[in-house]
UniProtKB/Swiss-Prot annotation:
Cofactors that this protein relies on: Mg(2+)
UniProt function note: Catalyzes the last two sequential reactions in the de novo biosynthetic pathway for UDP-N-acetylglucosamine (UDP-GlcNAc). The C-terminal domain catalyzes the transfer of acetyl group from acetyl coenzyme A to glucosamine-1-phosphate (GlcN-1-P) to produce N-acetylglucosamine-1-phosphate (GlcNAc-1-P), which is converted into UDP-GlcNAc by the transfer of uridine 5-monophosphate (from uridine 5-triphosphate), a reaction catalyzed by the N-terminal domain.
Name recorded for this polypeptide: Bifunctional protein GlmU
Pathway participation: Nucleotide-sugar biosynthesis; UDP-N-acetyl-alpha-D-glucosamine biosynthesis; N-acetyl-alpha-D-glucosamine 1-phosphate from alpha-D-glucosamine 6-phosphate (route II): step 2/2; Nucleotide-sugar biosynthesis; UDP-N-acetyl-alpha-D-glucosamine biosynthesis; UDP-N-acetyl-alpha-D-glucosamine from N-acetyl-alpha-D-glucosamine 1-phosphate: step 1/1; Bacterial outer membrane biogenesis; LPS lipid A biosynthesis
Active site: 359 (proton acceptor)
Keywords: Acyltransferase, Cell shape, Cell wall biogenesis/degradation, Cytoplasm, Magnesium, Metal-binding, Multifunctional enzyme, Nucleotidyltransferase, Peptidoglycan synthesis, Repeat, Transferase
The encoding gene: glmU
Catalytic activity: alpha-D-glucosamine 1-phosphate + acetyl-CoA = N-acetyl-alpha-D-glucosamine 1-phosphate + CoA + H(+); N-acetyl-alpha-D-glucosamine 1-phosphate + UTP + H(+) = UDP-N-acetyl-alpha-D-glucosamine + diphosphate
Name of the top EC class for this enzyme: transferase
Residue ranges of the region described as Pyrophosphorylase: 1-225
Cysteine disulfide links: none
Protein residues bound to UDP-N-acetyl-alpha-D-glucosamine: 6-9, 20, 71, 76-77, 98-100, 135, 150, 165, 223, 329, 347, 362, 373
Amino acid sequence: MNIVILAAGTGKRMRSALPKVLHPLAGRPLLSHVIDTARTLQPSRLVVVVGHGAEQVKAAVAAPDVQFAVQAEQLGTGHAVRQALPLLDPAQPTLVLYGDVPLTRASTLQRLVDAARDGRYGILTVTLDDPTGYGRIVRDASGFVTRIVEQKDASPEELKIAEINTGIIVTPTAQLSMWLGALKNENAQGEYYLTDVVELAIEAGFEVVTSQPDDEWETLGVNSKAQLAELERIHQRNVADALLVDGVTLADPARVDVRGTLRCGRDVSIDVNCVFEGNVTIADNVTIGANCVIRNASVGAGTRIDAFTHIDGAELGANTVIGPYARLRPGAQLADEAHVGNFVEVKNAVIGHGSKANHLTYIGDADIGARVNIGAGTITCNYDGANKFRTVIEDDVFVGSDTQLVAPVRVGRGVTIAAGTTIWKDVAEGVLALNEKTQTAKSGYVRPVKKKS
């Protein structure tokens, strides 16, 4: 089977410099969703017709299995499909999809393909309570499809028809070239409509069949930011429903967003306003507090992530405790039972088994062993303005509050670092490290008093 995806439109109503098919739905371009669905049908040829912003669209979705045809002028859907003909296998049927219709299920498309076997012409239709704006399916007294009429060209009687054309079709490819060549642009838009091919197929004696999706929203397209927002919410609700079916507890299914792939184990609980981006894996018995953002991360079993935590590109072991208000940046690796508390940032660092950094700390480019305590206000000074350096803290080290570790530096096993110490040299195992200071008390000191006006 050939699949052609039309993605050449300008999208004027989006009021954006970004090509319409590249606007994100759940964090990925609309067109990417359509291509992914198309791939599940295992086409022999997959062709995307580009036009407006062609190079930008190509760059966004380029892949070995995707070919591109260019529609230099936007002269209608029939003209767009014509540009793809040289890339198609004429011996295989062609399924036509749209780059701005991202939610159609693969099963819906497969039913249409099955209905159109043996050289039939298939149309995906929907019956709507309000069909305003859509092309109508015109049938004869026996119920056979005779033509499709666009809203702007429909008569008053035809406007009463509730069954509409979604634009998604399956057609014999060998005849499609001839039919497209016979199209005329004698309509209100002055365009070559793909919908007019159905009349030519009927005239040629081809049987026209129809199929409908399980849900109306499967064929909704995007022509404005309002419609994009509507589809986003539909998609997110579908994702939430799937999570609930899998046993995930969602405090409010309407207030969780998944912008990528989220895989959850058993007994996972997610509070409100959480966002998951990229590829996220969550093991069993994980609790996630409100307003967390988790991106491209893996979370070990039994972990608790408290509210307002941001995790990006991190790996969390089992039974870790994170947050609230913690930030784990790319390269953060936490071993089992590690704790990272409020206003702690970890970047490109390993924190060992049972180690804790509970308050107001920056750990960057560091290797921290097991059972290490990092006091509040500790900073690994990893950057000299040009280069990054690593800090190594071995097992069982106690780091007092307000400590600065100036990398590159190594702190040996079992060291105790006194509060307020700056470490700029390696520290041997088992010692107390401190910067000796003198505390002075001056008698007779008078605190300044603010003058009253």
